[in-house]
From Swiss-Prot:
Its EC number is 1.1.1.290. This is Erythronate-4-phosphate dehydrogenase. The gene is pdxB. The keyword NAD applies. Belongs to the D-isomer specific 2-hydroxyacid dehydrogenase family. PdxB subfamily. It is an enzyme of class 1 (oxidoreductase). HAMAP family: PdxB. It comes from Tolumonas auensis (strain DSM 9187 / NBRC 110442 / TA 4). NAD(+) binds at residues 147, 206-208, 232, 257.
Amino acid sequence: MKIVVDENMPLAEALFAEFGEVVRVPGRTMTAEQLADADILLVRSVTKVNAALLSQATNLKFVGTATIGTDHIDKAVLAEKGINFTSAPGCNKVSVGEYIISALLVMAEKYQFSLSGLSLGVIGAGNTGTAVAERASALGIEVKLCDPLKEQAGDPRSFVSYDEALQCDLISFHVPLSREGEHATFHLLDKKYIQALRSEQILLNASRGEVWDNQAMLLRQQSAEPLLLVMDVWENEPDILHELVPYTDIATPHIAGYSLEGKYRGTYMLYEAFCQQFGYTVTKQLKQLLPVADINALTLNANTDEVVLKKLIHLVYDVRRDDARFRHQIGLPGRFDEMRKKYPERREWSSVTISSEQNNDELVKLGFSVSGN
């Protein structure tokens, strides 16, 4: 069995080598010739899996993407060819949630305000949106969910309209990219909405770049009343609109979901689906594959107010480090993908156990491991 995987996918050999030959190839430049004798294909969001790519893949039986989004996969072609498909929904939801909270704490420090009591419109209440909402609520933020598809499907949570969500102090986007239908998300935030927003609002996008009209956003940012922006995703990656970067407060190269746990979890979910599809027993456990974090234990002697929480959170992950690297390198050719490929190891908050006798409800809700309370 020949298993072709994206060169940047972790754990591929550890999880799949027992089933056949694991061949790593660059995801963004993958060719039909490389899949000519492949049985299994495992990709990330940079690979467009379509009829052209699969034109020579006569042996292909299974395609998996280690991502939440599937807009890079032509599912109709896979169905037509009888190729089984799986994705990794929720694999990096914790990582994205922690990215957003880290960014909001940076903004609160930069502009001298408290997050508690502010309103947050979460556009898209799936895995990542829910993870953001849960963590924001733990900080005392009033969360308003907007997801017409989930609302129509009978989700029991309370929802608001898109227009109401856009009135919030903070607005975070967590929708998949779709270009057709009543609730298409391509340019969901278009010129009309961008121009109507208040200059003191903070907007965050860690979903897909095309959800925001980047050109219209640049025009707004060049006006007398720019918005406050946190951008992890961009239109036309990796050839992004470089002119927009200086007008953002936080800018990163599509790495919100790039915690070590998130990356490992994505590949592991494909391993589980592969085993189920082909009748193999799942013999490996994700926890056994994760290394011990460099910072894995802390003792806390203070109550967890917003200042203490910020210090703890940024000790584990401070988004400003990614922002600084991005601004330093983005003008160089090919650096967008290179920064993603060589992204430094980042751990989730659950990798740290905090010993404390204080009330640590917020820490538990945020995802830290807590002992002693």
